[in-house]
C-alpha cells in the first residue's frame, strides 16, 4: 500500500494539467500503472485523488451501502458521480476535468497534501483561508472518542 505524506506547492497550467511531484511518480506508476481517480471532498473545498487500486477499494465500500438509504445514495451520487479517471503522462502530469477544477476553485497555484492513502488538492487561496481555522480547531475543544486513544 502506498502512503502519501507531506505538503507540496504545485502549479496548474492553462489546460488544467498539474504535475505530480517526482517523489510520488514511481510509486504511483508501480502501484496503479499511472492511473489515478479524482473526486470531490464532501466536507472541504478540495478534491481527493486516489491511485486506481485504492479507489477500487473505496468504490466497493460505497457500492455496498444500502441504496434505499437516502444519505447513502447521496454520498454514492456525489463521490461516484464526480469520480474521474486520470492517467499520469510521461512527465508526471494529469489533466483535471473542468468540473472538478471548478468545484475546488482551482487556478494556477495549488496545494497537494498527502493524506496517507490519498492526496487532497486545494486551491492555494482556499488552503490559505482554511488552514488557520483548522489549526485553531485542532488546538482547542473536545477530543472525539476516536481520537482520545491516539498518542503522538
Swiss-Prot record:
The keyword Transcription regulation applies. It holds the Pfam family MraZ. GO terms for molecular function: DNA-binding transcription factor activity; transcription cis-regulatory region binding. The keyword Cytoplasm applies. Residues 7-54, 83-126 form the SpoVT-AbrB domain. CDD domains: MraZ_C, MraZ_N. One of its GO terms (biological process) is negative regulation of DNA-templated transcription initiation. It comes from the Bacteria. GO terms for cellular component: cytoplasm; nucleoid. It is found in: Cytoplasm, Nucleoid. Its main location: cytoplasm. PANTHER family: TRANSCRIPTIONAL REGULATOR MRAZ. Forms oligomers. NCBIfam families: division/cell wall cluster transcriptional repressor MraZ. Belongs to the MraZ family. This is Transcriptional regulator MraZ. It comes from Hydrogenovibrio crunogenus (strain DSM 25203 / XCL-2). The lineage of its organism: Bacteria, Pseudomonadati, Pseudomonadota, Gammaproteobacteria, Thiotrichales.
Amino acid at each position: 500500500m502506498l502512503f502519501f505524506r507531506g505538503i507540496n506547492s504545485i502549479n496548474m497550467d492553462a489546460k488544467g494539467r498539474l504535475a505530480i511531484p517526482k517523489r510520488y511518480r514511481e510509486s504511483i506508476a508501480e502501484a496503479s500503472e499511472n492511473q489515478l481517480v479524482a473526486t470531490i471532498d464532501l466536507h472541504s473545498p478540495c478534491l481527493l485523488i486516489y491511485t486506481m487500486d485504492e479507489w477500487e477499494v473505496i468504490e466497493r465500500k460505497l457500492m455496498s451501502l444500502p441504496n434505499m438509504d437516502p444519505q447513502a445514495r447521496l454520498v454514492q451520487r456525489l463521490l461516484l458521480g464526480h469520480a474521474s479517471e486520470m492517467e499520469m503522462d510521461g512527465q508526471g502530469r494529469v489533466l483535471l476535468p473542468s468540473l472538478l477544477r471548478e468545484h475546488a476553485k482551482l487556478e494556477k497555484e495549488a496545494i497537494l497534501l498527502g493524506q496517507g492513502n490519498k492526496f487532497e488538492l486545494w486551491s492555494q487561496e482556499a488552503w490559505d483561508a482554511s488552514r488557520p481555522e483548522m489549526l485553531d480547531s485542532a488546538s482547542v475543544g473536545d477530543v472525539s472518542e476516536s481520537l482520545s486513544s491516539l498518542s503522538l
